[in-house]
Swiss-Prot record:
Keywords: Adaptive immunity, Cell adhesion, Cell membrane, Cell projection, Developmental protein, Disulfide bond, Glycoprotein, Immunity, Immunoglobulin domain, Membrane, Repeat, Signal, Transmembrane, Transmembrane helix. Coiled coil: none annotated. PANTHER family: CD166 ANTIGEN, CELL SURFACE GLYCOPROTEIN MUC18-RELATED. The lineage of its organism: Eukaryota, Metazoa, Chordata, Craniata, Vertebrata. Glycans are attached at residues 92, 171, 350, 441, 465. Present on all retinal ganglion cells (RGCS) and their axons (in embryo). Absent from mature axons along most of their length, but is present on new and growing axons derived from the RGCS at the retinal margin. Remains on adult RGCS only at cell-cell contact sites and is continuously found in the retinal axon terminal arbor layers of the adult tectum. It comes from Carassius auratus (Goldfish). This is CD166 antigen homolog. The chain crosses the membrane at residues 500-520. GO terms for cellular component: axon; dendrite; plasma membrane. It is found in: Cell membrane; Cell projection, Axon; Cell projection, Dendrite. It is a single-pass type I membrane protein.
Length: 555
């Protein structure tokens, strides 16, 4: 009896009160459960009798989905179409639609009936789906410089609403200008799911600079974020504008080496066959861009060219220089000369460039070659001449030997440091090295020989006065010289006599110096009296003495 009363109250409320007319919107995800709130999920009214969900069918007529009595736990599903197995009601009276699809994009109405009121809340459902990642397909194999070509097609699938596609080059958006860039977009819908696929075709006029450009396609959708395709690069075809010839062999090029010439063109794809002009002779090479000269000589120096097979005017030129160095030295090897003779050294050189010449003597660098017009013993040695240009060096040499008859230049004596011995020194010049013979026995202290100069020393203890001779010999001749050597006693007496003589000579020199000074003084004094005309004061005897002294001859 109570439920009947409630039902009658509901009908009265439905007749008295007008339902609300405001329509809200809810976004559902494709394939997910769509939640449609009733009155934005607010608290249920007091005296609730039941809640009913209904919808607008495709033909515009209303259709019932379910009713939930306030006193019952379960709702009664009244739908007979596809919603029968997909709809349910939540505890807050929200409508739950399982496995949402684009067919659910319609208006759903929640009717709330209580003892005091009847309200209807309409909600429009929209179903969104994020598109698949964008993919560039049907790519062009290559692009031609200056020619409008379809670069590729960008595709995204299964989206709602449809995605927008944007083409970019090096992250810069490409804009359709109707001439050099043309972008054509189309949208297709799946007949079953209703989902949209978007495709965009790009026609692009490439330039040479695009050889390293990267093209991408960006998909923009309300579900965000933006999705970007994998970057694509394309070979750019363009004709040759410049030919270049390179000498790839290591510089400098020397006689006997191989020289490789390489011809390159800036076209793409690059030409693979060329004409080489080898000093006026045309040589065609196919399927390669190099030509090799084997075992070059100085005669191969000259102008070389290369050009395209179909265009001889477009060519490149290189001058090839083969480096060479010819050197002749006179004399070479071992050279034997006598001291005082003349030696003429001549160096002849022929080179592809200015040659640098350096001389060394016995491994020591010389500023210049010595003057050999009058050879000395010090001129002997190994002379090496290095002549070089870049990459080439020649070394020639001669070993000069200067010979001469021995000649003694000095024979001296002095006491040893302890004063008990006499040291005789005999110095001589000659080559080969002279041998020495002394006329007395003694101790040979040292022998040195350098640059044709020999030094011999002999230590003796003479017991009497001696005459010592030094004899030097080599294969060319000999020389001898003598020196007197006194015993220690005689030498001491001689030294004392020398001291006495020195003292006497010193006294005589001092006396002469005093007399000279006195004479100069008297002479100056007399000249002073004549000049003044005055008579000197004094006796007549003093005047006579002065007069006599003036007439005496100087001693």
């Amino acid at each position: 009896m109570q439920s009947v009363v409630c039902l009658i109250g509901a009908f009265i409320a439905a007749a008295v009160f007008r339902p609300g007319s405001c329509v809200g919107t809810v976004i559902g995800l494709y394939g997910e459960t769509i939640v449609v709130p009733c009155n934005d999920g607010t608290k249920k009214p007091d005296g609730l009798i039941f809640t009913k969900w209904k919808y607008v069918k495709d033909d515009g007529s209303p259709g019932d989905l379910l009713v939930k009595q306030a006193q019952k736990d379960e709702a009664t599903v009244s739908a007979t179409d596809g919603y029968k197995s997909r709809v349910s009601i939540a505890a807050n009276s929200s409508l739950l639609i399982a496995r949402g699809s684009l067919a659910d994009q319609r208006v759903f109405t929640c009717m709330v009936v209580s003892f005091t009121n009847l309200e209807e809340y309409s909600v429009e459902v929209k179903v969104h789906k994020k598109p698949s990642a964008p993919v560039i397909k049907n790519n062009a194999k290559e692009l031609e410089n200056g020619k409008l070509t379809q670069l590729g097609e960008c595709v995204v699938e299964n989206a709602n609403p449809p995605a927008d596609l944007i083409w970019k080059k090096n992250n810069q958006t490409l804009v359709d200008d109707g001439k050099t860039i043309i972008i054509t977009s189309t949208i297709t819908k799946d007949k079953i799911t209703g989902l949209s696929s978007t495709s965009s075709r790009l026609q692009y006029t490439a330039r040479k600079e695009d050889v390293e450009s990267q093209f991408t396609c960006t998909a923009k959708h309300v579900m965000g974020p933006d999705q970007v395709s994998e970057p694509e690069s394309f070979p750019i075809h363009y004709p040759t504008e410049k030919v270049s010839l390179q000498v790839v062999s290591q510089s400098p090029i020397r006689e006997g080496e191989d020289v490789t010439l390489k011809c390159q063109a800036d076209g793409n794809p690059p030409p693979t066959s060329f004409n080489f002009n080898i000093k006026g002779k045309k040589v065609t090479v196919t399927d390669k861009d190099v030509y090799t000269l084997t075992g070059v000589t100085r005669a191969d120096s000259g102008i070389y060219k290369c050009s395209l097979l179909d265009n001889d005017v477009m060519e490149s030129t290189q001058f090839v220089t083969v480096s060479f160095l010819d050197v002749s030295l006179t004399p070479t090897g071992k050279v034997l000369k006598n001291v005082g003779e003349n030696l003429i050294v001549s160096l002849d050189k022929n080179a592809s460039s200015e040659a640098k010449v350096t001389w060394t003597k016995d491994n020591r660098k010389l500023d210049k070659l010595p003057d050999f017009s009058k050879l000395t013993y010090s001129d002997a040695g190994l002379y090496v001449c290095d002549v070089s240009i870049e990459g080439i060096k020649r070394s020639l040499s001669f070993e000069l030997t200067v010979e001469g008859i021995p000649k003694i230049t000095s024979l001296t004596k002095h006491r040893s440091s302890d004063g008990k011995h006499k040291v005789l020194t005999c110095e001589a010049e000659g080559s080969p090295k002279p041998d020495v013979q002394w006329s007395v026995n003694g101790t040979n202290d040292e022998v040195s020989y350098n640059n044709g100069k020999a030094t011999y020393k002999l230590t003796v203890v003479p017991s009497k006065n001696l005459t010592v001779s030094c004899l030097v010999t080599n294969k060319l001749g000999e020389d001898t010289k003598e020196i007197s050597v006194f015993s220690q006693k005689n030498e001491d007496g001689t030294e004392q006599a020398k001291v006495i003589v020195g003292i006497v000579v010193g006294l005589l020199v001092a006396a002469a110096l005093v007399g000279l000074i006195y004479w100069i003084y008297i002479k100056k004094t007399r000249q002073g009296s004549w000049k003044t005309g005055e008579k000197e004061a004094g006796t007549s005897e003093e005047s006579k003495k002065l007069e006599e002294n003036n007439h005496k001859p100087d001693v």
